[in-house]
Amino acid sequence: MKSGFVSIIGRTNAGKSTLINSLLEEKIALVSHKQNATRRKIKAIVIHEKNQIIFIDTPGLHESGATFNQLLVQSAIKSMEDCDVILFVASVFDSTKDYENFLSLNPQVSHIIALNKVDLTDNATLLKKLSEYAKFSEHFKAILPYSSKKKSYKKGLLDEIVKCLNEHEYFYDPEFLSVNSEKELYRDFILESIYENLSDELPYSSEVLINRTKDTPNLLILEANIITDTNSHKGMFIGKEGATLKRIGKDARFKISKLAQKKVLLKLFVTVKKNWQKDEEFLKKLLNDEN
C-alpha cells in the first residue's frame, strides 16, 4: 500500500482543475476558462488499486506584479515543497517555455509531465510535442498524454504517480473525495457561477465569503457575501432589478445541491471593500495562508 501527496503545477488555464475532476469522476475543483480561477489549494483524493493519492490543485504559475497574484504564485510554489511528487500539467498546444520556467524554480522532488487536451489534436502533433520535451528527459520521471474530457490514459498516469510514492498507510479516510471543507467547496461553486455569468474582467475584482451555513436533513441554508472593490462593480453584480445576482444564485444553487444531495436555500449579498486585492492580511485569510 502506498499513499502520498501530488502537487499539480502548471500555468493558468493548463487544465489542472479539469484534470482533477476527471480523475475523481466528480466535480470538486473550480473550473473556468478565466485565468487564476483556482485561488485556494484543493486537496482531492483518488484511490487507485488500493493506493491513496492526494492531489493538491494549486493556483496557476504566471508572471504578475499584483499583490493578489503574487500570493497565488507563492502558494503554488510552496506546495511544491510539501509534496511527494509534482504533476506538471501543460496543454499539448503550449510551447515548452512554461516547463522551462518551472525547471528554473529548481523543484526538489520528482515530477511527471501530463500533456493535456490531446483529444483536440492529431497523433502527428502529439508526437511532435513529445519530441520537443524529449530534450528535458533527464529532469522528469515520465511524460504522458492525457485527455481530461475523454479520460484517456487515466490508468497510465495514475500508475506512474504511484511509482513515485512511498509505502505508507492511508492519510485520510478512503471514503473522502476531498479534505477541503464543504464550506470551501460551496464558496468555489459560487465563484465559478460568477465567472460563468459575468464579463472577462469583472470576476477578478471579486471574492466570496461564506457567512453562515445551516445544514438540516432536507435543506442546506447558506448565506454568502460577494466582495467587490467599487460601487459600480456592485451594481453590475446585482444587475437590473437584481437579475444578474439571481442568475448567479440559481447556477450556484444547482451546483451546490448536486454536491450536497439536498435542496439548497442560498442568500447572496454584494459588499464593497475597496482595494481588497492589495490588503495582504485579507488575502492571506482568503488563501488559507495564515500562520
UniProtKB/Swiss-Prot annotation:
Era-type G domain span: 2-167
GO CC annotation terms, alphabetical: cytosol; plasma membrane
An annotated GO BP: ribosomal small subunit assembly
Keywords of this entry: Cell inner membrane, Cell membrane, Cytoplasm, GTP-binding, Membrane, Nucleotide-binding, Ribosome biogenesis, RNA-binding, rRNA-binding
Residue ranges, annotated region (G2): 36-40
Chain sites annotated for binding GTP: 10-17, 57-61, 116-119
G5 as annotated region, ranges: 146-148
Record-linked Gene3D superfamilies: 3.30.300.20, P-loop containing nucleotide triphosphate hydrolases
Alphabetical list of InterPro entries matching this protein: G_ERA_dom, GTP-bd, GTPase_Era-like, KH_dom-like_a/b, KH_dom_type_2, KH_sf_prok-type, P-loop_NTPase, Small_GTP-bd
NCBIfam families given in the database record: era, PRK00089.1, small_GTP
Subunit-structure text: Monomer.
Protein's UniProt name: GTPase Era
Native species: Campylobacter jejuni subsp. doylei (strain ATCC BAA-1458 / RM4099 / 269.97)
The gene coding this protein: era
